Every structure is written in C-alpha cells, then in structure tokens.
From Swiss-Prot:
Residue span(s) of domain F-box: 13-59
CDD domains: F-box_FBXO39
InterPro entries: F-box-like_dom_sf, F-box_dom, FBXO31/39, LRR_dom_sf
Task performed by this protein: Substrate-recognition component of the SCF (SKP1-CUL1-F-box protein)-type E3 ubiquitin ligase complex.
Recorded superkingdom: Eukaryota
Full protein name: F-box only protein 39
PROSITE patterns the UniProt entry points to: FBOX
Lineage of source species: Eukaryota, Metazoa, Chordata, Craniata, Vertebrata
Subunit structure: Directly interacts with SKP1 and CUL1.
Native source species: Mus musculus
Keyword Lipid metabolism: no
Alphabetically ordered keywords of this record: Ubl conjugation pathway
Length: 443
C-alpha cells in the first residue's frame, strides 16, 4: 500500500514538474502576491516563473489614509514590490485614500520618493501612470510635504515622460504654477511629448481661472499626439482650442469636459474656435459633464452649436431652485445637437415642473441616442411611452435607466405599475435593452 502511495506521489510530482511554462504562468497570474510567494518556494522552475514579466505588467498600489494595524505594512510592501518587480511594470495606478493627518501624508510622500526613484532607475517600460484624488490643497498636506511630493513627481516625469502614453493626475488640486510645472516635466527630455491620453480633471484647485493662464497654454502646446483629453471647463479658452487644432488635429478623438459650479466658467469662447477644431480634428467627439450648472443662460454660453457633442450629463444632485426651469434647455438648447448626441444623463430636482413631454420629444429628436439615464420627478407612464416608441422604431436606445422620484414614502402603486409595464414589454426589454427602472421616495 505504501509503495502504491509513493508511486502516485511521484507521478503527481512529475506531472507538475513537467507542466509547460505557459500553463504555469497562467496559474501564477490568478494568484495573489502571498500565494505567488509561497508557490515560488516549491522548486527552482516555479521560482523562475515568479519573475515572468507578464505577471507584473499591471499594478494597483493602494495606501490607506487612516491609521490602522491592518494597513501598517502597506508602505513597506509597496517599496518592496517596486524594488523586486518594478522593472516589469507597464501600467501603474497609485491610490491614497482620504489621508487623515499630516503624519500619514508625510509617510506617503517619503514612500513615493523612494518608489518613484527606484522605478526611474530600473524601469523603461512604463506606459501608463495614474495617481488620482490626492487633493493636495487640503490642510493635511503641509507646504513642505506637498512641495517635496511635487518635486519627486516632477523629477520622475522628466526622466520617464518620453515613455508614457497615458497619464492621469485627476483630483490633484494644484495651483496653476505647480500644475504647469508638472506638465512641463513631461517634455523635459525633448521639446514635445507623445502622450496620447491625458486626464487633468480637477488637476487644478477650485476657483482658479486657468483659461487665462499663458503658462497653461504653453504647457499644453508641448502635447503633439493627444487622442483622449480630460479636463475642466475652467481650462478651456480660444488659445487652447487653437493649440489643439495646430498640434493634435490628426489624433484628437475625445475630449471630456467637466464644468462644476465652483469652477469659473463665465469665460467667452468663440464658436469659430470650436468650429476650427472640429474641422481640423474630424473624428473629434466632446463629452460634457455639468455639476450643479443647470441654468439655461449658463449652459447656452458653453454648449455652442459648433461643438461636436457626443454626450451630456446634467446633475444638480438634490438641490432645488424654484426659480430654475429645465424646460428651455430640453426644448431649445439640447435639440441643437440632435445629429450627434448619443448619451444623455440627467439628475435633477424638478418637483416644481413636469418635464415628461419635453424629455420624450428630446429622445425622439436625437436619432443617434443609444443611452438615456434620468433621476427626476416623472410620471410612471413616461417609461411606457419610451418603450412604445422603441417598439415602433422611433428611437434606438440600448440603455434605459430611470429613477422616478415621488413625494410619498410608499411606492407600492408605482412599483405595481412598473411591473405591469415590464410584463407588457418584456420581450422588447430582454432582447434590446439594458433596462433599470425604479420608483424612489424623495422626502
């Protein structure tokens, strides 16, 4: 019996020992760091697999912003990883979640200094870097700590900028001078940089009129290969659009523009500047995201008819203004983009006015619209009207998401009606739509 067991064990060992490298790498790919380390101790071959480049190309490093024993070692382990496997990295994402105090921001800054220094020395593969939501304008970031972090990041980008294809510094919240210093670091080794994706949404602090900065326009002039550009509307100017027309006309495909109520957005941007950019960059599509910028007069200054608008998101959260009306925007402004609009997202408190008819007509007018999401005060029958239009071929939605606000705690009646509507159009919904509809008490 013992001999049979030994034979079986030898067979099992030989089976694993002769497993092809491609299969072993696939097994390792599914393992977490701790299990990979344990597996690497099995034999020399498995240890060699541990150092396969394709296991370490993508990495997300998360630092907790709260003091905790559980997360105490994450700063040290991040450095250990970069020293051990950093040379294989191609895509790196770093997260620092809601720092609690200056002690933790200092610890993060010191860790980042070592991490970026090591990465700059050992890596020549990095294509994508994302460091989001640092919010460096918060009080937990003392001036010296903030300055040291910016210095380390700038030095790293000076060395690695020529390799980077994608850079996201969303939510950094810098001054204009600090932000432009970092952007200029990308082109330090040459007079231009070839990054194709740049995300600088909330890169600058609130209340800054970046559109008037010559520093910013000069920094953006170094980009010659942009395909995707994400930024705030307080960065948009005729000069920036002119720069994009001259330097990125052959590549620029998507612009994502966020306009927040606290960001300056009263600047004059001429339609001819947008028209020139749209003409030069013929494949350009622009997506707008408005947060608490809802009044028609403001929107009309921004949403010029010359812009090739693909998507519009209008969100006011739960703020209610009885002097505000959404109707002119739905009937006069948005239909201007009927030939290009593909996505519409609404979230507003319209308790003081009914908009069912205007919303329905807008959907019918935008023949390319495939995504429609709305959270608002609506009649339940609004959903049925949309489904009927879809069935009759008057619209071609792929996604329909509706949250129907009500002024009652109980939504039993609305829920029952929605179930009846679903049963009536179930075949259509199941075959054509990503469908989510719910009644929601708004008290």
């Amino acid at each position: 019996m013992d001999e049979d067991c030994e034979v079986t064990q030898l067979q099992e060992q030989s089976c694993w020992a002769t497993l092809p490298d491609v299969c072993l790498r696939r097994v390792f790919w599914w393992l977490g760091d701790r299990d990979r380390s344990r597996a690497a101790l099995v034999c020399r071959k498995w240890n060699q697999i541990m150092y396969s480049a394709d296991l370490w190309r993508y990495r997300t490093i998360t630092f907790s912003g709260r003091p905790s024993r559980v997360h105490a070692s994450e700063f040290e382990s991040a450095l250990w990883y970069i020293k051990k496997f950093g040379r294989y990295l191609e895509h790196l994402e770093i997260k620092f979640l809601n720092p609690y105090n200056a002690v933790l921001t200092k610890k993060f800054q010191v860790t980042m200094r070592g991490l970026l220094s090591c990465l700059g020395k050992s890596n020549n593969r990095l294509r994508s870097l994302s460091i989001q939501h640092l919010e460096l304008d918060r009080l937990v970031w003392r001036n010296s700590i903030r300055g040291s972090l910016i210095k380390s990041l700038s030095f790293f980008l000076k060395k690695m900028g020529k390799h980077l294809d994608h850079l996201s510094l969303k939510g950094a919240r810098l001054t204009v001078e600090q932000g432009c210093h970092i952007l200029n670091s990308l082109s330090y080794m040459q007079n231009e940089n070839m990054a194709s994706e740049l995300n600088i949404e909330d890169f600058f602090s609130h209340h800054l009129a970046v559109y008037g900065s010559s520093q910013f326009n000069k920094a953006m002039a170094t980009f010659r290969n942009l395909t995707f550009l994400t930024l705030n509307y307080n960065c948009i100017s005729d000069e920036l659009l002119e720069t994009l027309s001259e330097n990125n006309a052959g590549t620029l495909r998507t612009m994502n523009i966020k306009c927040h109520v606290h960001d300056p957005h009263g600047q004059v941007v001429w339609g001819m500047s947008w028209a020139k950019l749209a003409r030069q960059a013929s494949n350009l599509k622009v997506n707008f995201f408005f947060e608490r910028v809802m009044k028609y007069e403001r929107l009309a200054r921004i949403l010029l008819q010359e812009i090739p608008v693909r998507s519009i998101s209008l969100r006011s959260c739960y703020f209610s203004d009885p002097d505000w009306s959404m109707r002119p925007t739905l009937t006069d402004l948005l239909p201007t983009f009927r030939n290009t609009l593909q996505k519409l997202t609404f979230e507003f408190n319209n308790n003081h006015e009914s908009l069912d008819e205007q919303l329905h007509l807008l959907i019918l007018a935008c023949r390319k619209l495939f995504y429609f999401k709305i959270w608002a005060f609506l009649d339940v029958k609004f959903v049925e009207r949309i489904l009927k239009s879809q069935e009759e071929g008057q619209c071609s939605l792929h996604t329909l998401k509706v949250r129907i606000y009500t002024n009652r705690y109980e939504t039993n009646e609305e829920d029952r009606t929605l179930r009846e509507i679903y049963r009536k159009y179930r075949k259509l919904i199941d075959s054509e739509l990503n469908y989510f509809v719910v009644a929601y008490p708004m008290m």
